[in-house]
Amino acid sequence: MSDYKFTLNLPETEFPMRGNLANREPEMLERWTKDGLYQQIRDSRIGRTPFILHDGPPYANGSIHIGHSVNKILKDIIVKSKTMSGFDAPYVPGWDCHGLPIELKVEQKVGKPGQKITAAEFREECRKYAAEQVNGQREDFIRLGVLGDWQNPYLTMDFSTEANIVRSLSKVIESGHLHKGVKPVHWCTDCGSALAEAEVEYEDKTSPAIDVAFVAADSKAVAAKFGVSDYSHPVSMVIWTTTPWTLPANRALSLSPELDYSLVEFEKDGVTQALILAEVLVESCLTRYNVESHTVLGTTKGAALELVCFNHPFLDFDVPAILGDHVTTDAGTGIVHTAPGHGQDDFVVGQKYGLEVANPVGDNGVYKPDTKYFAGQHVFKANDNVVALLREKGALLNHVAYRHSYPHCWRHKTPIIFRATPQWFISMDNHGLRTQALKEIEQTQWIPDWGQSRIEKMVENRPDWCISRQRTWGVPITLFVNRETEELHPDSVSLMERVANRIEQQGIQAWWDLDAAELLGDEADQYRKVTDTLDVWYDSGSTFSSVVAARPEFHGHGVDLYLEGSDQHRGWFMSSLMISTAMNGKAPYKQVLTHGFTVDGKGRKMSKSIGNVIAPQTVTNKLGADILRLWVAATDYSGEMTVSDEILNRSADAYRRIRNTARFLLANLNGFDPAKDLVAVEDMVALDRWVVRRAAALQQEIIEAYDQYNFHIVTQKLMQFCSVELGSFYLDIIKDRQYTAKQEGHARRSCQSALFHIAEAMVRWIAPVLSFTADEVWQLLPGERDAYVFTQEWYQGLKSVTLATDLSDDYWQQLLAVRNEVNKVIEQARRDKRIGGSLEAEVTLFADATLTEQLTHIGDELRFVLLTSEAKVLPLADATTEAVETELASLKLVVASSTAEKCERCWHHREEVGTIEAHPTLCTRCVTNIEGDGEVRQFA
């Protein structure tokens, strides 16, 4: 036989080298949908322990962005890995469908409700718009390879969910946590509605900063508090504020009880007067007022000035000095202008003193008609007029432009105000909600752990939750209030259940269509229907009850995990915690995981104006979803997640390494039937047994990393295994045995068995991350199997067997280190053109006694490990002058070009080539593999 190529076991597979993911993935998605893959997974886990990841609903408005992709991919990785661990892990995606952004979009199309269109018609348009947005986002999420119940997602606008939201509110009421009050809330004058804490963003703004004097009603009496008797000049208390427009609502001056205050006298423009200022701020204040010299007449504690009265600077009444813990000396005068209708601290301290909660400002930010001086003016435009009036009254001591951080509406990006309005609140303290919530935070696992202290601080400091909104498209607060007493109907809880039953059939419009007499009968005239809607954060925050507790696939099991971006500590995590604790006395989750925001390669937020936005649709169309998924998994999500074209291209390079490894495995399993060809691990060649043992240990590490949500560690370990243990060592060594050994011989079948075990394990390792590629690999693996890898559990065939005669893992690591040193010297010889390929080389290893014993243990098989035609081991002391030192102190090397003939079939240079009459171009080993029983390998 002259052409020996046909006697080789050449690799062959249908698995292409190039993934062509952008084109192949959509085809696979079609098959997944056609085969009902998600339901197959569900069926495979019937009766197993549930693991419930509850999807925080994205808002049904606009296209998905890279942050959405990160979130959904992380969730998908967890659900798939938990399924692989044997859990029943359903994934029901959801959408947040009510609220202002949708209203604004619909207004642009059909106008405001009550103008060209009725409120009922407007709600129907909102429902249609939200449904369209859901459909668009759903397709994009599916394209990412995220498996879930996409045909039956939960929508907060589902009639059943709307009804359950109402039911959850009834439980909050039943527990005594709801109250109505006039309180200052974040108010957007553009929205015409209250805002939740989560709807407020802080941006820099320039405001007028003014110092204002409030003259004492009885200056002599006030001076006496400082130990000054018979004082004849005017005494004033000075406040500093950046919101002059709130001065019409001023009802007090707040001081710190333990702070020292000074009475400071000076003369300016021929007038002698005395000011009360915090002692530590006297110098900075008087510098602002251009006072060159002064006298401190006396000092006293703030507590001594309690209830002393001062004239309002332009209104005809006096205001008291009161004491509050919120007063600091960080800026200003140490005395705080207090308007209970326009500030949370002001409101709280005002309640202690029974102050009027004055609110002269309407919904649109314009002063009401009965506001003296400023009626009909918008508050921000009125600032200059307030300053002018103060100057006219002689009360203005200083006025400058001041740049500071100020709350803005997250939708309109415009400054908001604090404004007292009648609203519905969930009380933080009336029935111990704050205390219980803090206890529940301690019982929850926060990932990363800094999430715990973050949400604790928020709960400790948050005000009562204003849950009412004055909007059209939202779940109604289905309450009846007594027209005279403003009290809730005594049967509110049972009435809400009857309303919920109607909403379940007809949607939220059922509330607005309801005639009160249908439920209240003769009492109807005594009560009015509440027209407010719920804060959308209540909608999403109650889904642990309105969705999870209601859908059968969750089996009534509590939620194990919430996973969202780090902004949700004050958003969904907070609202869910508040509602669940109010309803059930416990948190709705056992674990809360947060991921960072996506930034570009320079650490900047994604912005259309900067032009650094990376759209997930662009990535999937160009590189494929698996590349995006690999980037997400490989990135440490605990901080900001950096993404750019360059970074994604690096992910594509890493992907190619994994794909090439998978291709090598599949190609070399050609013709292998595990049912009859599988060699038991204990009967394998030692190197094969080692790699199976190594894979078994790695699998435990990978499963542990998945369980701890450390996906970047999963990818690191996977890449290390593919690149080092496999790529640079095992796969390189076994090529010779795989290609040249007898096809049915033990040496080759042992190797194929190891490759089979690795492939079976690896396809499962990558399935949660590289879902499309895993499916592609799964379809080409030999042996009978289920239709999809996603219904499987972690591979159980990786037996970690160590025989008494086996070489230790440390031995193989040492051999790997030796091989690396040999490769370096061979590479230099190639560069020097002393040899071509490594099989042209004969290597002499000069080693110390310990290393010599290790190297000679595997005898002639050492050459197969080193990929050389000959390998001799001699004592280190015998090293010749030409021997090259290595990074191993125990090893020196000499590489020479072999003088033996090259075997035509295996390319090894062997002395016997040319001596075998029947096969003059072959070595003895190849003849044995062609005509005999096949070579015997013990070690490698």
Curated annotation (Swiss-Prot):
Chain positions recorded as ATP binding sites: 608
CDD domains assigned: Anticodon_Ia_Ile_BEm (cd07960), IleRS_core (cd00818)
GO CC annotations, alphabetized: cytosol
Family membership: Belongs to the class-I aminoacyl-tRNA synthetase family. IleS type 1 subfamily.
Catalytic activity reported: tRNA(Ile) + L-isoleucine + ATP = L-isoleucyl-tRNA(Ile) + AMP + diphosphate
Gene Ontology biological-process entries: isoleucyl-tRNA aminoacylation
InterPro entries: aa-tRNA-synth_I_CS, aa-tRNA-synth_Ia, Anticodon_Ile_BEm, Ile-tRNA-ligase, Ile-tRNA-ligase_type1, Ile-tRNA_ligase, M/V/L/I-tRNA-synth_anticd-bd, Rossmann-like_a/b/a_fold
Details of cofactor binding: Binds 1 zinc ion per subunit.
Subunit structure: Monomer.
Root EC class: ligase
Name this polypeptide is given: Isoleucine--tRNA ligase
EC number of this enzyme: 6.1.1.5
Localisation: Cytoplasm
UniProt free text on domains: IleRS has two distinct active sites: one for aminoacylation and one for editing. The misactivated valine is translocated from the active site to the editing site, which sterically excludes the correctly activated isoleucine. The single editing site contains two valyl binding pockets, one specific for each substrate (Val-AMP or Val-tRNA(Ile)).
Residues the record lists as binding L-isoleucyl-5'-AMP: 564
Keywords recorded for this protein, A-Z: Aminoacyl-tRNA synthetase, ATP-binding, Cytoplasm, Ligase, Metal-binding, Nucleotide-binding, Protein biosynthesis, Zinc
Protein residues bound to Zn(2+): 903, 906, 923, 926
